[in-house]
Amino acid sequence: MYGKYWDAFYQKTYAAGKALWDVPPEESVLKDYEVFGPAFKQVETVLDIGCGTGEQSKFLGGLYTKVIGVDAAPKAIEIARASDHPPNVQFQVGDLSDAAFMDGLRVQFGDMNIYMRGVLHQIRQPDRTKVANNLLHLIGDKGALYLIEVGKNIKDYFRSASRAFHELPEAVQETFISNLPPHGVDESEIATLFQKEGYQLSQHGPGFLNTNLLLKDGTPVKIPSVFGLIAKN
């Protein structure tokens, strides 16, 4: 369902340069690791959902025994597979809303941890409950799910953002805003989506996602976000 759109995105974006959210893993995964690290200890398999071209997956491969990077875009997975990556990291094309694909992962790998950065806010509202159930099915009894997502009203935030953001050229501002989703996710939606008997949202709160767009003083533009950590009680 989502593969066609994202494949077109990667075909276009990677001909012109990196997407705004492509930042070094040290500025993304490593910061998130402070939250999910202790919860990912029961199983050594990590599913990196929305892996894109695989930089996050490769970084996770240095922390865990087995990492599977999944993305709906065949072009992104093609780039990831062609890159230099460790033998404990593999890449697959797959759609979170595809129950058969998700069941296949469960059969192949059993309980797993899930790292998901900036994906849920791109899922259509009617599909989100189904996707949340698929994710809980994958973590099973021993795994955990960490997600960090673009916050609500994100475009309005940047249209009224700090003076530093508005000092950027107008064309850059508009390009940045046009790449953001119209609606984000908030903590209450995360709590509702993953409210299933036996599972607990143990940590949640506000955060930010780094981008590779720099302000005039050299600091990166940050996107307000929310995070959640879910596991079996």
Task: Pin down the residues of each PLM region.
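A conserved beta-strand element that flanks and buttresses the S-adenosyl-L-methionine
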Residues: Y115
